[in-house]
């Protein structure tokens, strides 16, 4: 396992003579151009593998999934972001092709990940093309997701496994699936979708967060009282630790909820989570978190580039809802993360890394699963962050 240094090399931070920092717009443009070349290599490689989607690259071998894996929508979504920036017809063709591979998940009712699967793929496709056929897929998917909402609990159930331990498990990742419900409410006029999303966000805010605004990974609820009976981790270092990607999911989720509802309480929650993250004593100097902020092995423990990418994308958006020094702080931290991720420390040379863009993500460290490898969702949120930053720089 490679050890990621606490500070980025000078080559990652500076360009040219005399240590002059490369202009941010140039960093973004170069990163997007590199990403397009790498993503096209991946798209070409998998084009003949019917129904398969890239998941990771481990021990020198491709690891793929079918559409049922929770990450299936991320590679199609990455293609849509590349297309948004390049308008390359080859990328558009691939984006449509890989998006179609996920369509059957509109009927998924046995997990909460239908939001990840469909909104990252069909949602971006609809936004960029206006393809009306994508609306039916998204609405059907939202109806499927809604079957996992239990009014007595007020939340969307995340998982169905480990029923001997959890009555009604909800993980912080689930905040990311609410955007699909809110889209469905706006599209269909059915306010029940919105009520579910708001209820889920409110109860998560009440029961998932500690006084310092870090979050537990898993909260299981009593199905009769609707109150938590277990708070613990599944992928973090310990039940009381701050698993880095989980903190990023929460930051992103509440920022998104404010954008879509205008409810001030969600903006305040996002700000509080940001304060926790940006001021954490174990946040590395380059802004790319360790896989868990409380790992006992810091600094000799893997980073999670996916957490940095999710954070950066969320902070860029959150900065648009803030003013003055607060907005500047969010943007400065996101810029640091983007510069780090775009550096040779984290961006793979073209044609390597299994054709993924970013290196050094961590999936589930406690299970020795996907440790210090590329991950499809790291690339997706990195492309989203680059796209958001490019828009901001052009505005």
Q: What is each residue range found by the language model?
A:
Residues 20-395:
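Glycan-recognition and catalytic cores of secretory/periplasmic carbohydrate-active enzymes
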Residues 1-4:
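Positively charged n-region of N-terminal signal peptides that target proteins for export
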Residues 6-9:
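Sec-dependent N-terminal signal peptides
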Residues 15-16:
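C-terminal motif of bacterial Sec signal peptides marking the signal peptidase cleavage site
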């Amino acid at each position: 396992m490679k050890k990621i240094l606490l500070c980025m090399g000078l080559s990652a931070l500076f360009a040219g003579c005399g240590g002059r920092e490369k202009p941010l717009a140039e960093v973004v443009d170069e990163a997007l151009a590199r990403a397009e070349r790498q993503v096209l290599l991946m798209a070409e490689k998998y084009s003949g593998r019917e129904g398969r989607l890239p998941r990771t690259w481990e021990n020198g071998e491709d690891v793929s999934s079918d559409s049922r894996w929770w990450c299936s929508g991320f590679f199609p979504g990455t293609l849509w972001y590349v297309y948004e920036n390049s308008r390359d017809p080859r990328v558009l063709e691939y984006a449509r092709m890989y998006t179609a591979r996920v369509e059957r998940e509109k009927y998924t009712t046995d997990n909460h990940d239908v939001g990840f699967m469909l909104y990252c793929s069909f949602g971006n496709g609809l936004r960029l093309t206006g393809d009306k056929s994508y609306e039916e897929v998204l609405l059907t998917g939202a109806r499927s997701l809604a079957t996992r909402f239990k009014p007595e609990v007020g939340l969307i159930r995340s998982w169905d496994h480990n029923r001997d331990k959890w009555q009604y498990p909800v993980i912080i990742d689930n905040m990311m699936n609410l955007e699909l419900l809110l889209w469905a409410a706006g599209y269909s006029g059915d306010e029940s979708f919105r009520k579910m999303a708001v209820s889920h966000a409110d109860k998560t805010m009440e029961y998932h967060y500690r006084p310092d605004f870090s979050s537990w990974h898993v909260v299981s609820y009593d199905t009769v009282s609707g109150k938590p009976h277990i708070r613990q981790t599944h992928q973090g270092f310990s039940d009381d630790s701050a698993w880095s990607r989980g903190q990023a999911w929460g930051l992103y989720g509440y920022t998104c909820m404010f954008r879509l509802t205008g409810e001030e309480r969600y903006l305040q929650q996002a700000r509080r989570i940001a304060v926790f993250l940006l001021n954490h004593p174990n946040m590395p100097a380059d802004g790319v978190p360790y896989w868990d902020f409380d790992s006992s092995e810091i600094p000799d423990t893997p980073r999670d580039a996916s957490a940095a990418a999710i954070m950066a994308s969320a902070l860029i958006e959150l900065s648009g809802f803030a003013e003055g020094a607060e907005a500047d702080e969010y943007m400065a931290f996101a810029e640091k993360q983007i510069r780090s991720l775009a550096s040779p420390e984290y961006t793979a040379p073209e044609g390597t890394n299994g054709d993924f863009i970013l290196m050094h993500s961590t999936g589930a460290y406690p299970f020795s699963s996907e440790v210090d490898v590329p991950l499809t969702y790291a690339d997706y949120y990195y492309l989203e962050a680059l796209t958001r930053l490019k828009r901001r720089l052009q505005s």
